[in-house]
């Protein structure tokens, strides 16, 4: 019993030779035998059918199965992570298909193998986009339904490729083409919008020139303006030549309408030019009366000032004459008696002062009389 057990475990290192005798390129002959990874519920794994001939023992039933599994495990552990990544699709089935592992092996070795296999499957093969779905059918559906090539032609189905499944997913290529089409549409819309803005800017400049030329003319009727605006506000499908023709046509229409409106206004002005004249003639007396009163008042003031000036001149003349006469009399008296000079001069000054006061009183009296006569003369108005 113990010898057989030791014989079993001693045979392990020698049986590692056949799996390592494969070519140096890293390809295993079992790789990609199952291209679609169906659920392995009732099937025996294809690895057991391909076991080496040295492990076949007819006298021990569970020995060949055990050593076949050990051979598979040793091959997986002996090779690098790149080999496990390349041979990942052969182990990526549902865990219910590996019932023979639970039946024939110890519980201590089974979780290690399953964790190692699941870890390699999650890290290497599936992308983060497909790691949410646990069902292998849902994961495989996009590759077989939407991919234009088969699974053998896809770059990540080969064992030696370093292309990730995310970079080759048809969803990504589809979104890329969708973004390209959106970019083309946006560039097309931007070009048409730019052409439309340029056309509108050109129309605005031409309209400003036309408006400067025809600013004194009357505006055309609303119907022609609406029709011309509809013809000019078409989308940018019109070429620049058509826009120029439309602008010239609109300018001609506006000139014709403005000429017609000018003729109508001239006729109206000629027809109604007589009425405002009569109205102005009827309104003239009021303005003339207002101006007449102002002129009358001004004339009265000027006449009053003229009368006062003339009266002052008369009073001055009289005053000078009196002064001259008194001066001659005093001079004659002083010549006769020089001692009377001081007394005569004092009397002369008093007389001259009295004559001046009389002249001022006479001027005031004249002004009051003149104002009273002017007030009496202006009452009838």
Curated annotation (Swiss-Prot):
It is found in: Nucleus; Cytoplasm; Chromosome. Ubiquitously expressed. Strong expression in the developing somites and limbs, the embryonic nervous system and the adult brain. Residues 1-65, 79-260 are annotated as: Disordered. GO terms for cellular component: chromosome; cytoplasm; nucleoplasm. Residues 175-187 have a biased composition (Basic residues). InterPro entries: Pphln1 (IPR028851). There is a cross-link at residues 123, 194, 213, 241, 249, 342 (Glycyl lysine isopeptide (Lys-Gly) (interchain with G-Cter in SUMO2)). Residues 157-168, 217-230 have a biased composition (Low complexity). GO terms for biological process: constitutive heterochromatin formation; keratinization; negative regulation of DNA-templated transcription; protein localization to heterochromatin. Pfam families: Periphilin_C. Its main location: nucleus. Keywords: Acetylation, Chromosome, Cytoplasm, Isopeptide bond, Keratinization, Nucleus, Phosphoprotein, Repressor, Transcription, Transcription regulation, Ubl conjugation. Homodimer. Component of the HUSH complex; at least composed of TASOR, PPHLN1 and MPHOSPH8. Interacts with SIN3A and HDAC1. May interact with PPL. Component of the HUSH complex, a multiprotein complex that mediates epigenetic repression. The HUSH complex is recruited to genomic loci rich in H3K9me3 and is probably required to maintain transcriptional silencing by promoting recruitment of SETDB1, a histone methyltransferase that mediates further deposition of H3K9me3. In the HUSH complex, contributes to the maintenance of the complex at chromatin. Acts as a transcriptional corepressor and regulates the cell cycle, probably via the HUSH complex. This is Periphilin-1. It comes from Mus musculus.
